[in-house]
From Swiss-Prot:
The keyword Transmembrane helix applies. It is a multi-pass membrane protein. It holds the Pfam family CASP_dom. This is CASP-like protein SELMODRAFT_406854. The lineage of its organism: Eukaryota, Viridiplantae, Streptophyta, Embryophyta, Tracheophyta. It comes from Selaginella moellendorffii (Spikemoss).
Length: 145
């Protein structure tokens, strides 16, 4: 096997992982990702709106009891987590708009932004799952009391 054929085999073997990484990173700055971020922001806004405006009124032994979201620590926690999710989604939607509009930026900078978004998504997902588990456990404790 000659030197030229060895280098072409090495290039083909090394190019495949690089191409798959680039294709994966391209997915983070696609218009579909932007639409998903906007949909998440809309759903978080609806969650907050329903949570804050809902009231439940019951009469027990001629005593009028009004239940609102701020009476329960679990619902306050849910409102805070929904607000954080809303802010995060809007922030990343803005980052995607900047990434989609700035096609004149160097590829290395775009890769860095894609990796930043990927890592931030992973960290946020872990934290959001932890918050969701805490909210559900607090909610179940409130249900047993």
């Amino acid at each position: 096997m000659g030197v030229a054929s060895q280098s072409s085999v090495a290039n083909e073997a090394g190019a495949a992982p690089e191409a798959s990484i680039q294709q994966t990173l391209r997915g983070f700055s696609s218009p579909t990702s932007l639409l998903l971020r906007i949909a998440t922001a809309v759903l978080c806004t609806l969650t907050l709106a329903f949570l804050v405006t809902s009231k439940e009124r019951k009469e027990i032994a001629s005593i009028d009891i009004v239940a609102i979201w701020s009476n329960s620590k679990a619902l306050i926690f849910l409102a805070v987590v929904s607000g954080i999710c809303l802010g995060y989604s809007l922030l990343h939607a803005a980052v995607f708009l900047v990434m989609l509009s700035g096609n004149r930026k160097p590829l290395a900078r775009k890769k860095a932004l894609d990796w930043m978004v990927f890592l931030a998504d992973q960290v946020f997902f872990k934290i959001f799952c932890w918050f969701s588990i805490r909210v559900s456990s607090r909610r179940s404790k409130a249900g047993f009391v």
